[in-house]
Amino acid sequence: MSEPVTVHGYTEQELMEMDPAVLRGIIHERIHHTIEVNIYRIMAGKRGIQKSFGETGEYLMDIWKRRGLPTDAPDIQWCLNYVGLARMLRTGGELDLGTELPEPFTDQEMETVNKLIYKRRSIRQFLDKPVPDELIRKIIQAGLYAPHGCNVGTTRFVVFKKPEEFKLVRSDIPVENCVMIVVCQDMRLYKAMRFDELVPQNIYYDAAAAADHICLMAHALGLGACWLTHGEETQKRVRKYLGLHDGFVSRNHIIVGWPDEAPIKSQRMKLDDVIITK
Protein backbone atom coordinates (compact mmCIF):
# COMPACT_ATOMS: atom_id res chain seq x y z
CA MET A 1 0.00 0.00 0.00
CA SER A 2 1.38 3.42 -0.95
CA GLU A 3 0.95 5.53 2.16
CA PRO A 4 -0.16 9.13 1.61
CA VAL A 5 2.29 11.78 2.73
CA THR A 6 -0.39 13.63 4.66
CA VAL A 7 -4.11 13.42 5.42
CA HIS A 8 -5.81 16.81 5.70
CA GLY A 9 -2.28 18.18 5.98
CA TYR A 10 -1.35 15.97 8.96
CA THR A 11 1.78 13.83 8.85
CA GLU A 12 1.91 10.29 10.16
CA GLN A 13 3.63 11.49 13.33
CA GLU A 14 0.95 14.11 13.90
CA LEU A 15 -1.77 11.52 13.38
CA MET A 16 -0.03 9.20 15.84
CA GLU A 17 -0.04 11.94 18.47
CA MET A 18 -3.45 13.46 17.71
CA ASP A 19 -6.27 13.44 20.25
CA PRO A 20 -8.21 10.20 19.59
CA ALA A 21 -11.53 12.06 19.26
CA VAL A 22 -10.11 14.23 16.48
CA LEU A 23 -8.45 11.29 14.73
CA ARG A 24 -11.75 9.42 14.89
CA GLY A 25 -13.51 12.30 13.17
CA ILE A 26 -10.90 12.39 10.40
CA ILE A 27 -11.26 8.64 9.90
CA HIS A 28 -15.06 8.95 9.68
CA GLU A 29 -14.81 11.71 7.09
CA ARG A 30 -12.12 10.09 4.96
CA ILE A 31 -13.89 6.71 4.90
CA HIS A 32 -17.06 8.53 3.88
CA HIS A 33 -15.56 10.67 1.13
CA THR A 34 -12.90 8.33 -0.25
CA ILE A 35 -14.80 5.03 -0.05
CA GLU A 36 -18.51 5.24 0.80
CA VAL A 37 -19.60 7.87 -1.72
CA ASN A 38 -17.66 6.15 -4.52
CA ILE A 39 -18.01 2.43 -3.95
CA TYR A 40 -21.60 2.09 -5.12
CA ARG A 41 -20.94 3.90 -8.40
CA ILE A 42 -17.94 1.64 -8.94
CA MET A 43 -20.07 -1.44 -8.27
CA ALA A 44 -22.69 -0.17 -10.74
CA GLY A 45 -20.05 0.27 -13.44
CA LYS A 46 -20.52 4.03 -13.52
CA ARG A 47 -17.03 4.80 -12.31
CA GLY A 48 -13.64 3.18 -12.73
CA ILE A 49 -11.63 1.99 -9.77
CA GLN A 50 -8.29 3.60 -8.97
CA LYS A 51 -5.33 1.47 -7.92
CA SER A 52 -5.20 3.34 -4.62
CA PHE A 53 -8.94 3.12 -3.93
CA GLY A 54 -9.51 2.85 -0.18
CA GLU A 55 -5.85 3.08 0.77
CA THR A 56 -6.22 6.35 2.68
CA GLY A 57 -8.86 4.76 4.90
CA GLU A 58 -6.69 1.66 5.35
CA TYR A 59 -3.72 3.84 6.29
CA LEU A 60 -5.77 5.71 8.90
CA MET A 61 -7.20 2.51 10.39
CA ASP A 62 -3.67 1.12 10.61
CA ILE A 63 -2.66 4.18 12.63
CA TRP A 64 -5.72 3.72 14.85
CA LYS A 65 -4.73 0.11 15.54
CA ARG A 66 -1.03 0.87 16.04
CA ARG A 67 -2.03 3.35 18.72
CA GLY A 68 -3.85 0.58 20.53
CA LEU A 69 -7.21 2.35 20.28
CA PRO A 70 -10.36 0.19 20.61
CA THR A 71 -11.89 -1.28 17.47
CA ASP A 72 -15.11 -2.75 18.87
CA ALA A 73 -17.30 0.39 18.68
CA PRO A 74 -19.98 0.32 15.94
CA ASP A 75 -18.56 3.33 14.10
CA ILE A 76 -15.06 1.86 13.99
CA GLN A 77 -16.46 -1.49 12.85
CA TRP A 78 -18.28 0.40 10.08
CA CYS A 79 -14.97 1.97 9.03
CA LEU A 80 -13.17 -1.38 9.06
CA ASN A 81 -15.95 -2.93 6.99
CA TYR A 82 -15.62 -0.27 4.29
CA VAL A 83 -11.84 -0.62 4.28
CA GLY A 84 -12.26 -4.36 3.72
CA LEU A 85 -14.81 -3.84 0.94
CA ALA A 86 -12.53 -1.34 -0.81
CA ARG A 87 -9.59 -3.74 -0.58
CA MET A 88 -11.69 -6.53 -2.07
CA LEU A 89 -12.73 -4.34 -5.01
CA ARG A 90 -9.19 -3.08 -5.49
CA THR A 91 -7.87 -6.63 -5.75
CA GLY A 92 -10.50 -7.76 -8.24
CA GLY A 93 -13.02 -9.35 -5.91
CA GLU A 94 -16.80 -9.16 -6.21
CA LEU A 95 -18.97 -7.76 -3.46
CA ASP A 96 -22.27 -8.98 -2.07
CA LEU A 97 -23.28 -6.42 0.53
CA GLY A 98 -26.44 -8.20 1.59
CA THR A 99 -28.30 -4.88 1.69
CA GLU A 100 -31.71 -4.07 0.23
CA LEU A 101 -33.16 -1.13 -1.67
CA PRO A 102 -35.75 0.95 0.22
CA GLU A 103 -39.35 -0.14 -0.25
CA PRO A 104 -42.54 1.89 0.26
CA PHE A 105 -44.07 1.52 3.70
CA THR A 106 -47.31 -0.39 4.02
CA ASP A 107 -50.49 1.56 4.75
CA GLN A 108 -50.29 0.47 8.38
CA GLU A 109 -46.67 1.60 8.65
CA MET A 110 -47.58 4.94 7.06
CA GLU A 111 -50.20 5.49 9.76
CA THR A 112 -47.41 5.37 12.32
CA VAL A 113 -45.24 7.74 10.27
CA ASN A 114 -48.11 10.20 9.86
CA LYS A 115 -48.85 10.05 13.59
CA LEU A 116 -45.20 10.74 14.35
CA ILE A 117 -44.83 13.70 11.98
CA TYR A 118 -48.25 15.34 12.00
CA LYS A 119 -49.33 14.73 15.61
CA ARG A 120 -46.13 15.86 17.31
CA ARG A 121 -46.46 19.12 19.26
CA SER A 122 -44.17 21.22 21.41
CA ILE A 123 -44.96 20.49 25.07
CA ARG A 124 -43.93 23.01 27.72
CA GLN A 125 -45.65 21.75 30.88
CA PHE A 126 -44.89 18.40 32.45
CA LEU A 127 -46.16 16.12 35.18
CA ASP A 128 -44.08 15.68 38.32
CA LYS A 129 -43.05 12.22 37.19
CA PRO A 130 -39.46 11.13 36.49
CA VAL A 131 -38.37 10.09 33.03
CA PRO A 132 -36.60 6.71 33.25
CA ASP A 133 -32.97 6.64 32.17
CA GLU A 134 -33.81 3.89 29.70
CA LEU A 135 -36.12 6.25 27.78
CA ILE A 136 -33.59 9.07 27.93
CA ARG A 137 -31.01 6.78 26.32
CA LYS A 138 -33.45 5.79 23.57
CA ILE A 139 -34.13 9.45 22.86
CA ILE A 140 -30.43 10.34 22.70
CA GLN A 141 -29.74 7.32 20.49
CA ALA A 142 -32.26 8.73 18.01
CA GLY A 143 -30.42 12.06 18.08
CA LEU A 144 -27.12 10.29 17.52
CA TYR A 145 -28.49 8.59 14.39
CA ALA A 146 -29.68 11.83 12.78
CA PRO A 147 -28.06 12.77 9.44
CA HIS A 148 -24.60 14.24 9.99
CA GLY A 149 -22.70 16.20 7.36
CA CYS A 150 -19.72 14.27 5.97
CA ASN A 151 -20.17 11.69 8.75
CA VAL A 152 -17.69 13.57 10.94
CA GLY A 153 -19.42 12.61 14.19
CA THR A 154 -19.00 15.76 16.28
CA THR A 155 -22.34 15.65 18.12
CA ARG A 156 -22.30 15.18 21.89
CA PHE A 157 -25.15 15.20 24.41
CA VAL A 158 -25.43 16.47 27.97
CA VAL A 159 -28.34 15.50 30.23
CA PHE A 160 -29.37 17.88 33.00
CA LYS A 161 -31.85 16.72 35.64
CA LYS A 162 -31.32 19.08 38.57
CA PRO A 163 -33.02 22.50 38.90
CA GLU A 164 -29.65 24.13 39.56
CA GLU A 165 -28.39 22.68 36.27
CA PHE A 166 -31.39 24.03 34.38
CA LYS A 167 -30.31 27.52 35.46
CA LEU A 168 -27.12 27.15 33.42
CA VAL A 169 -29.19 27.28 30.24
CA ARG A 170 -31.06 30.46 29.44
CA SER A 171 -34.66 29.60 28.60
CA ASP A 172 -37.63 31.78 27.70
CA ILE A 173 -40.09 29.30 29.23
CA PRO A 174 -40.29 27.75 32.73
CA VAL A 175 -38.24 24.57 33.02
CA GLU A 176 -39.55 22.15 35.63
CA ASN A 177 -40.52 18.49 36.06
CA CYS A 178 -38.41 17.47 33.09
CA VAL A 179 -34.97 16.52 31.90
CA MET A 180 -32.96 18.77 29.61
CA ILE A 181 -30.93 17.31 26.78
CA VAL A 182 -28.31 19.75 25.51
CA VAL A 183 -27.03 19.11 21.98
CA CYS A 184 -23.33 19.96 21.82
CA GLN A 185 -20.45 19.67 19.38
CA ASP A 186 -16.73 19.08 19.63
CA MET A 187 -15.54 21.86 17.35
CA ARG A 188 -12.00 20.47 17.27
CA LEU A 189 -13.19 17.88 14.75
CA TYR A 190 -14.63 20.49 12.37
CA LYS A 191 -11.56 22.69 12.70
CA ALA A 192 -9.14 19.82 12.12
CA MET A 193 -10.59 19.50 8.61
CA ARG A 194 -11.29 23.23 8.16
CA PHE A 195 -15.02 22.55 7.91
CA ASP A 196 -15.63 25.64 10.03
CA GLU A 197 -14.21 27.60 7.07
CA LEU A 198 -15.29 25.47 4.09
CA VAL A 199 -18.80 24.34 5.10
CA PRO A 200 -19.70 26.26 8.28
CA GLN A 201 -23.41 25.72 7.68
CA ASN A 202 -22.98 22.00 8.34
CA ILE A 203 -22.27 22.74 11.99
CA TYR A 204 -25.76 24.11 12.59
CA TYR A 205 -27.51 21.59 10.35
CA ASP A 206 -25.96 18.72 12.31
CA ALA A 207 -27.18 20.10 15.64
CA ALA A 208 -30.66 20.82 14.26
CA ALA A 209 -31.05 17.34 12.79
CA ALA A 210 -30.11 15.78 16.14
CA ALA A 211 -32.64 17.94 17.99
CA ASP A 212 -35.40 17.03 15.55
CA HIS A 213 -34.77 13.30 15.94
CA ILE A 214 -34.82 13.73 19.72
CA CYS A 215 -38.23 15.42 19.57
CA LEU A 216 -39.65 12.73 17.29
CA MET A 217 -38.46 9.85 19.47
CA ALA A 218 -39.76 11.55 22.61
CA HIS A 219 -43.18 11.83 20.95
CA ALA A 220 -43.08 8.17 19.88
CA LEU A 221 -42.40 7.16 23.50
CA GLY A 222 -45.41 9.09 24.80
CA LEU A 223 -43.30 11.92 26.18
CA GLY A 224 -43.49 15.61 25.38
CA ALA A 225 -40.61 17.76 24.21
CA CYS A 226 -39.79 21.31 23.24
CA TRP A 227 -36.73 22.34 21.26
CA LEU A 228 -35.09 25.62 22.26
CA THR A 229 -31.92 27.51 21.38
CA HIS A 230 -29.47 29.56 23.40
CA GLY A 231 -26.48 31.85 22.97
CA GLU A 232 -22.83 32.22 23.86
CA GLU A 233 -23.33 32.97 27.55
CA THR A 234 -25.09 29.65 28.01
CA GLN A 235 -22.34 27.93 26.04
CA LYS A 236 -19.71 29.36 28.40
CA ARG A 237 -21.64 28.37 31.54
CA VAL A 238 -22.22 24.82 30.34
CA ARG A 239 -18.58 24.42 29.32
CA LYS A 240 -17.33 25.77 32.66
CA TYR A 241 -19.74 23.65 34.69
CA LEU A 242 -18.61 20.47 32.93
CA GLY A 243 -14.94 21.45 32.96
CA LEU A 244 -14.56 20.96 29.22
CA HIS A 245 -12.18 22.42 26.64
CA ASP A 246 -12.93 25.60 24.68
CA GLY A 247 -13.82 23.60 21.57
CA PHE A 248 -16.86 22.10 23.30
CA VAL A 249 -19.89 24.15 22.23
CA SER A 250 -23.57 23.70 23.11
CA ARG A 251 -26.01 24.52 20.28
CA ASN A 252 -29.57 23.88 21.43
CA HIS A 253 -31.49 22.14 24.18
CA ILE A 254 -34.63 20.04 24.38
CA ILE A 255 -36.77 19.73 27.49
CA VAL A 256 -38.43 16.33 27.82
CA GLY A 257 -41.03 15.03 30.25
CA TRP A 258 -44.46 13.48 30.70
CA PRO A 259 -47.02 15.86 29.12
CA ASP A 260 -49.27 17.90 31.40
CA GLU A 261 -50.93 19.81 28.56
CA ALA A 262 -52.50 19.01 25.21
CA PRO A 263 -51.98 22.13 23.08
CA ILE A 264 -53.71 22.72 19.77
CA LYS A 265 -51.45 21.51 16.99
CA SER A 266 -50.01 24.44 15.04
CA GLN A 267 -50.88 24.53 11.36
CA ARG A 268 -48.87 25.48 8.28
CA MET A 269 -49.60 27.31 5.07
CA LYS A 270 -51.13 25.50 2.12
CA LEU A 271 -48.59 23.34 0.33
CA ASP A 272 -49.11 25.13 -3.00
CA ASP A 273 -48.30 28.45 -1.31
CA VAL A 274 -44.81 27.35 -0.30
CA ILE A 275 -43.68 25.51 -3.45
CA ILE A 276 -41.86 27.96 -5.69
CA THR A 277 -42.06 27.38 -9.42
CA LYS A 278 -40.68 29.28 -12.39
Regions from the PLM with identified roles:
Residues 1-278:
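Acidic, surface-exposed loops and disordered segments
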